[in-house]
Amino acid sequence: KGKAGELEFARLCRSNGFDAVRRTAQYCGKTGNASDCVGLPGIHIEVKRVERLSIDDALNQSRRDAEAAHDGSLPIVAHRRNHTRWKITMMQ
C-alpha cells in the first residue's frame, strides 16, 4: 500500500491547494532518507497507509530520516486506515 498511500496523500494535498506536493519516488526518484512526498517546504513527510500502525515507530522513522537530510525539516506522519480519514501526527 506504500505507493498507493503516497499517491493518495499527494492528491489530497493538491486538492486542498498545496499544488506542489508530489510523491518523491514519482517526482525525483526515491533516495534513502527522502521524504515520501515533496512540496511542503520545511516538512519531512512519512506516509503510512496501513491497518496496524505503531505511531511511535513511524514518528521515529520520520525523525531519523529528517535528521539525516540535514535540512531542519519538521518530521510528520500522514496516516490512515481503510474507511477512515487522513490524520497527521508530528513530533517536535
Spell out what each predicted region is.
Residues K1-Q92:
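Catalytic phosphate/metal-binding cores of nucleic-acid and nucleotide-processing enzymes, i.e., regions
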